[in-house]
Regions:
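Extracytoplasmic
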Residues: 3-521
Length: 522
């Protein structure tokens, strides 16, 4: 009898805890709009300004045009070059330009119309250390913005062989080998904060472009000042596709592509893995190690991509479903850009997102109303590439990076005045000595509150990581109201800045596992 009562009490206790958790999740998310509404958050305060950002670069040329014509650079007519060599009859090309790890090469380019252009390159990697290639890009002898100093170019990897099976029936993952093939890309943000390729401003007339080696050699076959294309919407995409649908013999076509069967990938760490935790992972075995998914912990940084091949039996429209799992970061979403045959078919494919969920999620690529996108494919073999992106959170993380930079400026200024351990019994009159610091703290507090609101709106809930920004916003608000708190909490202030920096790094991770992709006729 006593045992039954005790068991009943435990059950009731568990139920109470579950009810409390549900009620907590149903609480309306706190909103801070009244704290920053009507405030010019773009204002600069003396001593707390970050120069050299891409945003400031764009703003400096905000009235510039976006010319419609591409301008191809003559790779082999370079003005100056160190660590460069012209290759002939190289990898199917009559000529190509080798650039060493520490190379510097400058080209002249005549620009008919001033404005913004993307920088488009076609390149191939060469055998080296196997890490990402890095270059700095200078326009007319100057770094246009700080992040142009580290433009990243990925490599291509594949399996050296089919998986082997040991005498116990366990699959052995094949080693990774580099694939040396021509690739095309635009110069873009390696952190993923800026989704679209960088826009570079060129004056009308003669300009120079300099590429300086930072890491690893590469061979170029093309460099173009590319006109900035407006991405098409799904509606526009459909309007440009043939009107014919699938034949009656093709209406039930289904092809399942296993995640572990990816053909190529951007890093050697994106190999096939095994999962025994979920029986709906396919293929599945309780007893043996079976390679049955790809990605996961290592597929975490913007720009990393995985590509699969698939085929369709005839021209027509097809739907695509991705079976993915984001069980790595509660309160976050993991996003991917979808490329079909090397191109993003329409702007809605720039970001597909997986919310946090313990189990696999079958995500059919569809609009906001759940209507599957119809992808037009011709008969034969095609590729689908999923590239990690920060999506809508990227711009918010960039704003947090800028905020951390400004907060460190504020901290260092106060550090010079008060020392690392301020006297708790001394009134430093910081609000009188440094009124600009108080103004900067007030503005930064409001910026952080706004970022918290926008991140919560994007993810649908407040994760612990973004709560760090709220903690700092509240502390800054407290400093403005009671300046004497600055010296009392000076060490905590520095710790909170450090914690926010760590949180930004963590929020910049976008981990995702892929079990399979399913292509079906419409």
């Amino acid at each position: 009898m006593k045992g039954s009562v005790k068991k009943a009490i435990i059950i009731i206790g568990v139920l109470i805890v579950l009810v409390i958790c549900v009620l907590l999740n149903l609480r309306p998310v706190e909103n801070f709009q009244q704290k920053y509404e009507g405030v010019d958050l773009s204002a600069d305060v003396e001593g707390a300004v970050r120069e050299g950002t891409y945003t400031k670069y764009l703003n400096a040329h905000e009235d510039a045009a976006c010319p419609a014509e591409d301008i191809e650079v003559d790779l082999f007519a370079y003005m100056e070059g160190e660590g460069v060599e012209v290759y002939e009859n190289y990898e199917g090309e009559e000529k190509a330009l080798y650039t060493d790890t520490e190379s510097t090469v400058t080209w002249k380019v005549n620009v008919p119309e001033a404005g913004f252009y993307n920088l488009y390159l076609e390149y191939i990697t060469v055998e080296s250390r196997g890490v990402a290639i890095e270059r700095s890009v200078y326009i007319n002898g100057e770094l246009p913005f700080d992040d142009a100093g580290n433009i990243i170019f990925t490599r291509t990897w594949t399996d050296a062989s089919e998986p082997k099976v040991d005498n116990q029936g366990n699959e052995i993952r094949p080693s990774q080998v580099e694939v040396y093939k021509w690739q095309s890309t635009f110069c873009k943000d390696d952190m993923g904060y800026i989704i679209n390729p960088y826009q570079f401003y060129f004056e009308a007339g003669e300009n120079t472009i300099t590429m300086e080696g930072v890491n690893e050699p590469m061979v170029l076959k093309k460099l173009t000042l590319a006109a900035i294309d407006d991405s098409v919407t799904y509606e526009e995409y459909l309007a440009n596709c043939p009107g014919e649908g699938n034949s009656e013999t093709n209406i039930n076509y289904v092809q399942v592509v296993q995640g572990e069967d990816s053909t190529i990938r951007s890093e050697s760490s994106l190999y096939a893995k095994y999962d025994k935790s979920a029986p709906n992972t396919q293929p599945y075995s309780v007893t043996n190690t079976i390679l049955n998914y790809v990605g996961g912990e290592t597929w975490c940084s913007a720009g990393q991509w995985i590509e699969w091949e698939f085929s369709v039996p005839e021209d027509g429209y097809y739907n695509i479903t991705v079976k993915g799992r984001q069980n790595y970061a509660r309160g976050s979403v993991s996003s991917r850009t979808v490329y079909i045959d090397g191109e993003i078919p329409f702007e809605e494919m720039e970001e597909i997102s997986f919310e946090y969920e313990n189990d696999w999620n079958n995500l059919t690529l569809a609009d906001a109303d759940g209507n599957p996108y119809k992808i037009y494919l011709t008969e034969g073999t095609h590729t689908i590439r999923l590239e990690a992106t920060l999506g809508g959170s990227g711009i918010l993380l960039e704003e947090l990076e800028d905020s951390i930079y400004r907060l460190n400026q504020i901290y260092r200024k106060l550090l010079v005045y008060t020392g690392a351990t301020p006297d708790q019994y001394r009134d430093y009159n910081i609000d009188q000595v440094y009124p600009e610091v108080m103004e900067a703290m007030d503005l930064e507090s409001k910026r952080l509150y706004k970022i918290v609101d926008e991140m919560v709106a994007y993810t649908g809930q407040k994760a612990d990581k973004i709560a760090t920004a709220q903690t700092l916003a509240q502390q800054l608000e407290r400093f403005v109201e009671k300046p004497n708190k600055i010296t009392e909490e000076f060490t905590t202030f520095k710790d909170n800045i450090t914690s926010l920096g760590t949180a930004v790094l963590n929020m910049g991770e976008t981990k995702l596992g892929i079990d399979s992709l399913v292509i079906t006729s419409t």
